[in-house]
Regions:
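A structural motif
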Residues: 10-15, 181, 205-206
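Small-residue (primarily alanine) positions within well-ordered alpha-helices
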Residues: 12, 96, 100, 105, ...
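Hydrolase catalytic cores
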Residues: 54-57, 77-83, 106, 192, ...
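Alpha-helix termini
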Residues: 2-3, 64, 144-149, 244
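Generic alpha-helical secondary structure signal
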Residues: 24, 204-207
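Substrate-binding/specificity loop regions of serine endopeptidase catalytic domains
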Residues: 67, 90, 113-204, 211-234
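Active-site core segment of subtilase-fold serine proteases
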Residues: 1-77, 81-88, 92-137, 187
Length: 244
């Protein structure tokens, strides 16, 4: 083992909410922020997406329970971008990412994005036309965010999405400075793309995303999605930064 992560390396998880009382995060939470309340009061949600995502990247080791995250000794910055009804906006996600960057996060995980349900009924040519010619204002905005992240030596990792369409239709995934993660099904031999995963030229890398075991609520659960694949890569980035 070269490293299990350094406490000097901080990982921000931008997500709907978190159970910060979960034992997997004991002693490693710093700089928690709720963009809706403008405070450090962070809540768990009924669909405990954020807690599960955070555990994949950061769950503790040697605590006699559950699972171990990819970077179990790195610091954890939880950033809640959903309100009490689990509503999120592009602005709240942007606020969360920028907060994490200026808070000094070394890597930011964003397992969130636009729902593109139904677009898989259209050909890849039509999907590529959307990427090439639409949402250009948003694309320029996200390019600026990535420039800010690069200036602060921060890596942004996005989940590719679960609509079985081309990655990059969502303009937050188009910047060269970000990492976009698709999902594979580890049960397939040879390993293949998960049925739901977005894919294509704007996908940077793939990681397991089917039946991933992690912290959830007060316990643990299996979840599937590119949301689960992204924090595996986020944890790896944190490990790489820990040995530099």
């Amino acid at each position: 083992d070269i490293t299990k992560g350094s406490p000097d390396i901080s990982v921000a998880i931008v997500d709907n909410g978190f159970n910060l009382k979960h034992p997997e995060f004991k002693g490693r939470v710093c700089g928690a922020y709720n963009v809706w309340r403008h405070s450090d009061k962070v809540d768990a949600h009924k669909v405990d997406h954020g807690t599960h995502v955070a555990g994949i990247a950061l769950a503790s080791m040697d605590n006699g329970a559950g699972s171990c995250g990819i970077a179990p000794q790195c610091a954890f910055i939880p950033v809640q971008v959903a309100d009490e009804k689990d509503r999120m906006t592009t602005t709240s996600i942007l606020d969360g990412i920028l907060y994490a960057i200026y808070q000094g996060a070394d890597v930011v995980n964003v397992s969130l994005g636009q729902c593109l349900n139904g677009l898989d009924e259209y050909s890849e040519a039509v999907q590529q036309e959307l990427i090439n010619n639409h949402f250009k204002e948003e694309e320029r905005l996200w390019n600026k965010v990535m420039q800010i992240a690069e200036k602060h030596h921060c890596v942004i990792v996005f989940a590719a999405g679960n609509d079985n369409v081309l990655a990059g239709i969502d303009p937050q995934q188009r910047s060269q400075g970000c990492v976009v993660v698709s999902a594979v099904n580890k049960k397939n031999q040879p390993i293949l793309k998960a049925d739901f995963s977005n894919y294509g030229d704007y996908s940077t890398v793939s990681a397991p995303g089917v039946d991933i075991y992690s912290s959830c609520g007060d316990g643990y659960a299996l979840m599937s999605g590119t949301s689960m694949a992204a924090p595996i890569v986020t944890g790896l980035v944190a490990l790489l930064k820990s040995v530099k």
